[in-house]
Structure formats: structure tokens, C-alpha cells
């Protein structure tokens, strides 16, 4: 029953068409890592390894001032299996993944629109970390940018960080299969 609530906290109505949800690359759970000097990209962009966009043509997904969108992993009635959960069948959108492993299939609710999947590094289904180790960000890519253009123009190459192990050793760790989202978005 994972979900993301996106609130329009402005005093004007806004359209969410094209809004990108980004799942960060790397773990954000502690102070046991640091960026390599001269290779810290964070002032220019964020790194992600999963990108989903709200579909629409510019004026299809209105979010009125003070209201919210709910995006869920599986738009199912979760109270059936857990009475303490909630009914996600009324969500605005769900993210859906076609899995390459028949043991880990996603559930698609045809009554809830799917986000447009631009990329996810997983070959199965994308889930949010149960303790928030990976950050979630939102961005508004330029109007007209396609998934194909994004993947061709925004790879994050040679990104690395230093992991400080509890055993006292430091390890240089690469960020693999990730793309950059400029902070201006």
C-alpha cells in the first residue's frame, strides 16, 4: 500500500501534466558516505534510477490550489488483506512495471491511469524502500521532452561516492544505471 501524495500548496490552480517522479540512486540513509571531491553533481542535478511521468498534454491533469494527487504502487483495495490499510482504488495514478521475472509480477488496475514509465533500473517491479532509504523527488521536465530524448541526453556518467564502512575501510562506489535531472526542472 505504498503511495506518494503530491500537494499543490500554492494559491493558484496548476496542471501536473508531465510532472516527473524520480527515485534517487544510492542510499540516503546515513552519514556514512561522501561525494568525491570534484565529482559532486548535487549542485547541478539529482541522480535517479527510476523515472515516471504524469501523462497529459498540458492541461489534462488539473490540481486545484490546496488539493492533492495520490500516486500509488498498486491501486488495489488493501483493506481486503489488512483492515488497517486503505482502499487505493480511488488513487489518481499508479506506477506499473512489466516484469521480466514471472515470480515478481506487478498488478495493474485498469480503472486507474498508469504513469508513463521513462526508465527504471529494476527488471522486475519498482517499490519504495520500506524505511525511506531512497529519496523521492519531483521535477517538471521541459515541455515536449520525450523519454527517448531524456535517456539519450541525460545519462549520469562516471558518478562515484566514497562509502565509509563500519569496519573502518573506505570504498569508492559507482552510481550505476542512473540519469541526471537538472535542478532547474
Can you describe what each PLM-predicted range is?
Residues 1-185:
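Activation on beta-sandwich/Ig-like modules and their edge loops
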Amino acid at each position: 500500500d505504498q503511495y506518494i501524495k503530491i500537494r499543490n500548496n500554492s494559491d493558484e490552480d496548476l496542471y501536473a501534466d508531465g510532472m516527473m517522479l524520480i527515485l534517487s540512486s544510492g542510499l540516503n540513509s546515513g552519514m556514512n558516505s561522501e561525494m568525491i571531491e570534484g565529482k559532486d553533481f548535487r549542485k547541478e542535478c539529482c541522480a535517479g534510477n527510476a523515472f515516471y511521468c504524469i501523462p497529459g498534454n498540458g492541461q489534462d491533469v488539473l490540481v486545484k490550489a490546496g488539493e492533492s494527487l495520490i500516486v500509488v504502487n498498486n491501486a488495489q483495495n488493501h483493506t481486503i488483506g489488512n483492515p488497517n490499510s486503505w482502499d487505493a482504488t480511488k488513487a489518481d495514478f499508479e506506477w506499473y512495471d512489466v516484469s521480466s521475472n514471472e515470480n515478481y509480477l506487478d498488478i495493474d488496475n485498469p480503472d486507474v491511469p498508469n504513469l508513463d514509465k521513462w526508465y527504471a533500473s529494476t527488471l522486475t517491479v519498482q517499490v519504495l524502500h520500506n524505511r525511506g532509504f531512497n529519496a523521492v523527488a519531483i521535477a517538471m521536465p521541459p515541455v515536449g521532452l520525450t523519454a527517448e530524448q531524456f535517456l539519450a541526453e541525460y545519462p549520469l556518467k562516471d558518478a562515484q561516492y566514497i562509502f565509509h564502512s563500519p569496519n573502518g575501510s573506505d570504498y569508492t562506489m559507482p552510481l550505476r544505471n542512473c540519469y541526471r535531472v537538472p535542478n532547474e526542472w
